[in-house]
Structures are given as structure tokens and as C-alpha cells.
Amino acid sequence: GATTSSGYVGQSTSAVYLDELAITTSGQQPSVRMVDIARIEALAGPQGTLYGADSQAGTLKIITNKPEMNVSELILDISVRDSSEGKGSHDGSIVVNIPLIEDKLAARFVAFDAKDGGFIDNVYGKTITNDLKADALYGRSPSGWGTLDNADVVEDDINDHKVTGWRAALRWEINDQWSADLTHIQQKTDSGSYSGFDPNVGDLQDIRYNEEFYKTDYNMSSLVIEADLGFAQLVSATSYYDQDLSFNQDITNYHKSYSAYYCIEYAGD
């Protein structure tokens, strides 16, 4: 979604919800794995105070399937794919619904493991040469012009993407008017290099000098209590959300171009 930012810190103007749990973050939003999902609601903006901050441009609400009373269910979904230009891929998930107390209590468990095989090759190359010799002028360039090669990180299919996680939910039908849902979700994402390539180097090829990665790890817990009060509907949502994000992107050639054109030594008196 769109963001408003100052420097490197961005605040989203569109909100993302997983059931009643707000998972909107600064900058890029978490990518929820679409397993055992009932529906997705796209609510046009601007939204009011029901969804709070970050809803000026709208709200995306992902609704999961809830535990079903008196139903025993097992769902397996497995797929395998191959590619002529890269590594193979797979996608597997399992859904289990377990009734615990008749008409009162049920649990639902979801687990998934998926991998998208890479198809971008990091081929051998050297850094660009620049006539301005900005390394001597600037003094902070990490390598000499035209001398650094990427022999240590040359590899095929560097842009693979892996995701694993699980979701556990417990639903209690307290009576005809009251219900409670307790949910916990964990998801880990481990991606390699970015999927762009340089057509001047070759088809699906690029020259990168550092190992790239993008990793996320998030945990979510929520307790939602709903009630029919007769004169109104009550929805109480209490949640905890924690996300760790780390990434590394190679900008060696960009740094060299920047240094050459913007770091100029002016002659003094």
C-alpha cells in the first residue's frame, strides 16, 4: 500500500487486519500465507475509527476459518513444480479440525511449508570503472574501482523463497449469546536475492558482490470475545504482535556511481 514517510521511516496509509488483529507496520506489510482462509475483504478508504490509524486509503481484512463444533476434519494439500530455468518448488499444508466438547469447544490447527525455487543467476563480474576515481576523492569506497570481483558469491538460482508456519485456534461457544476465540500464529520467511536481473549481463543474470537475503519472523496472539447484547453487538479484541525483520541488499555499483558524480573535490584558494 501507499506510505507516507520521513527519510527511511514510513507509515502506511492502508491497514492490514488478520481477523480482528491489526498487523499494519511501518513500511512494508507482512505477507500472510493464504492457507485455510475463509475470505478477504477489501474495504475502500478512507475508513473511520472502527479500524483506527493507517486506514486513510482503505483496509484489507483477511478472515481465517474458525474451529467448527462437532466436526472432525483433515485437509492435506501438496503440490510440486519444476522449472526449466531454475530450481524446483513445493507447497504443502495441513488443516485439522478437532471437536473437544460437544456444542461447546473445538480446536483448529494449520501448518504449512513452501518453497519457490530461484531462477536468477549471479554470474562472475567486476565493479565498474570510473574516470573520476572517486575512491581517492571520497576515501570511503569499500573497494577499488574496477578491481573488486564477486568470485566468492557466484551462484545459480539465488532468488529462492521459503516460508514455514502454523496457526492454532480454540473456539468456545459459551452460550447462545457469547463466544470466545483464542488464536496464535507463527510464520518465518527466508528469501534469497531479489528477483531483478540486468539484460546487459544476460537473460535472468546479474552481477552482485554481496550475499543478499530478506528474512522475517512474526508471532501473533489474540483473544476475541463476541456477544449479542440485544441492543448491540460486542466485539472485544486483545492481541499481541511481534515481528523481526532483517535484510541485506547489494548496492556496490550504485555506490560507485553515486561517489563518482556527487563526491567531487573542489579546488581551494
Question: Can you describe what each PLM-predicted range is?
Answer:
Residues 1, 30, 42, 55-79, ...:
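N-terminal periplasmic accessory domains that precede
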Residues 84-191, 219-221:
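Transmembrane beta-barrel wall of Gram-negative outer-membrane proteins
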Residues 124-132, 187, 196-205, 241, ...:
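Flexible, surface-exposed loop regions and adjacent strand-edge segments
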Residues 43, 75-79, 108-112, 183-185, ...:
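Transmembrane beta-strands of outer-membrane beta-barrel proteins
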Residues 90, 158-175, 183-185, 210-249, ...:
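Outer-membrane beta-barrel transmembrane strands
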Residues 79-82, 151-156, 206-211, 259-269:
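Extracellular loop and loop/strand-boundary signature of outer-membrane beta-barrel proteins
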Residues 179-218:
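Flexible loop and strand-edge segments within Gram-negative outer membrane beta-barrel domains
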Residues 5-7, 13-14, 19-46, 94, ...:
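Short acidic/polar hinge/loop motifs at secondary-structure boundaries
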